[in-house]
From Swiss-Prot:
Its cofactor is Mn(2+). PROSITE patterns: AIPM_HOMOCIT_SYNTH_1, AIPM_HOMOCIT_SYNTH_2, PYR_CT. GO terms for molecular function: 2-isopropylmalate synthase activity; acetyl-CoA C-acetyltransferase activity; manganese ion binding. GO terms for biological process: L-leucine biosynthetic process. This is 2-isopropylmalate synthase. Residues 5-267 form the Pyruvate carboxyltransferase domain. Keywords: Amino-acid biosynthesis, Branched-chain amino acid biosynthesis, Cytoplasm, Leucine biosynthesis, Manganese, Metal-binding, Transferase. It comes from Aeromonas salmonicida (strain A449). CDD domains: DRE_TIM_IPMS.
Length: 524
């Protein structure tokens, strides 16, 4: 049996299902490229049949990712598998992941079928997927609550049909470690062709046991773990990639296995996913929480000062957490910025140095001192605003006070034109938003508004995240500035630019459909 555990990341499929607002294609590609740098073996990036947008995202990622295998999900239905196969065709190598429920409650209550019907559907789905690729994964949904005899039959039939990987999900996070490990052990003991496939596990965290269940399964012979960055996912989330990766590394003495994960990329990848998905990481979260390497007890502090390994079993450096927080000023040159970015794990090709340096100088003039966390925030926001902006903030002014009606004046660049507007509102942010809505013509409803400091002290950058609804769709917007009113304006403009681009894509697709229909009519 191999001593390598395959890491199957499903942040962009199972993880994204938990988000209030869907990620854009560009944001999904950013995360996919980060996962590739991290060294995941397989990345499941969407469910192509679910929507044209998901199909496009899967296709775009499949076209760009070269060093990780791209995978798409499909129910055990021909149309799902065809959509996945078509979306993935552009990849150098890809996997189709098809699934069907196997527990009695799912088979009888959800599918309204017999287990024999489900068995036949699973086998047919695998054979259909093999038309597109020889790398087919099959999942027995709700395996944790499936009668063991039925589970053994399904696994044996799936392997015989040609599935290379068999996934055993604890779909509702119901099992405990000894129970789940026992299921894996029973499969190895009772399924005669088990050696012809890799056994995978996909554990949810409803009872807080997803990581423990996954590690226990590895001890019983499973060699693929399905997980997400920061453990994001439906309900209580999924098995956390960073936790299993560091467990397998730190306790290699006990577990005797390894992964291909580049552990120094963990912090950076976690931060990116948290930012783009608008899902803050809890401070006390293992590995990537803000307090993961903090010591407040006097006894602990004394021990760490004498020898770090008294209370630290892993180091901040091992996950890529920057330790040398050098302060920079407007007198710092480009070479300093480049050096600090390199020290934080950013290759020069991943950012525009001239653009970043310009943003740095502007911030340094406002703050005086700029720190690594400021620089990282600037780099991140430069990346998300790389696309041409149809609406751009040119000027913002507000007047407000305890006994003054808040008034705002805003000037936006709309295409090539400058448009001004003034408005009053229930506070300065509301007044600014009234101006922006009038200029752009979009009626936006703000569902969520969150403000957080990026950095330390009164001069910290203010980041604003909003979730907005427009015509039944949710959009996520972000803004960053030393002035929280300005960052609030940027966040709404970010949303409106996303809506505008989505409208442009929809119009183009409609024109293409009309053109195709016209050609078909003429040919008839």
């Amino acid at each position: 049996m191999s001593d390598r555990v395959i890491i199957f990341d499903t942040t962009l499929r199972d993880g994204e299902q938990a988000l209030a607002a869907s990620l854009t294609v560009k944001e999904k590609l950013q995360i996919a490229q980060a996962l590739e740098r991290l060294g995941v073996d397989i990345m499941e990036v969407g469910f192509p049949v679910s929507s044209p947008g998901d199909f496009q995202s899967v296709q775009t990622i499949a076209r760009h990712i070269k060093n990780s295998r791209v995978c798409a999900l499909a129910r055990a239905l021909p149309q799902d598998i065809d959509a996945a196969g078509e979306a993935l065709r552009v990849a150098e190598a890809f996997r189709i992941h098809t699934f069907i429920s196997t527990s009695s409650i799912h088979v009888e209550s959800k599918l309204k079928k017999s287990f024999e019907d489900v068995l036949e559907m699973g086998v047919s789905a695998i054979k259909h997927a093999l038309r597109y690729t020889d790398d087919v994964e099959f999942s027995c949904e709700d395996a944790g609550r499936t009668p063991i005899d039925n589970l053994c039959r399904m696994v044996e039939a799936a392997i015989k049909a040609g599935a290379r990987t068999i996934n055993i999900p604890d779909t509702v996070g119901y099992t405990v470690p000894t129970e789940f490990s026992g299921i894996i052990q029973t499969l190895f003991n009772r399924v005669p062709n088990i050696d012809k496939a890799i056994i995978s596990v996909h554990c949810h965290d409803d009872l807080g046991l997803s990581v423990a269940n996954s590690i226990g399964a590895v001890q019983m012979g499973a060699r693929q773990i399905e997980c997400t960055i920061n453990g994001i996912g439906e309900r209580a989330g999924n098995c956390s990639l960073e936790e299993v990766a560091m467990i397998l590394k730190t306790r290699a003495d006990l577990l005797g296995v390894h992964t291909n994960i580049r552990h120094s990329e963990i912090h950076r990848t976690s931060a990116l996913v948290s930012q783009l998905c608008n899902m803050p990481v809890q401070p006390n979260k293992a590995i990537v929480g803000a307090n993961a390497f903090s010591h407040s007890s006097g006894i602990h502090q004394d021990g760490v000062l004498k020898a770090k390994n008294t209370y630290e079993i892993i180091t901040p450096e091992s996950i890529g957490l920057p330790q040398n927080n050098l302060n920079m000023t407007s007198r710092s040159g480009r070479h300093v910025i480049k050096h600090r970015m390199e020290s934080m794990g950013y290759a020069e090709s991943s950012y525009d140095l001239d653009h970043l340096y310009g943003k740095f100088l502007t911030l340094a003039d406002k703050k005086g001192q700029v720190f690594d966390y400021d620089l990282e925030a600037l780099a991140f926001f430069s990346q998300i605003h790389e696309e041409p902006e149809h609406f751009k903030l040119e000027y913002l002014g507000v007047q407000s006070g305890s006994s003054v009606l808040a008034t705002a004046s805003v000037k936006l660049k709309v295409g090539q034109d400058l448009v001004c507007e003034a408005a009053t509102g229930n506070g300065p942010v509301d007044a600014v938003y009234q101006c922006i809505n009038r200029i752009t013509g979009y009626e936006i409803r703000i569902d969520k508004y969150a403000l957080k400091a990026k950095g330390e002290g009164k001069n910290a950058l203010g980041q604003v995240d909003i979730v907005a609804e427009y015509k039944g769709r949710k959009f996520h917007g972000m803004g960053l500035a030393t002035d929280i009113i300005e960052s609030s304006a940027q966040a709404l403009i970010h949303v409106i630019n996303s809506i505008w681009r989505a409208d442009q894509v929809a119009e183009q697709m409609e024109r293409n459909v009309t053109k195709t229909d016209k050609i078909n009519t003429e040919s008839v």
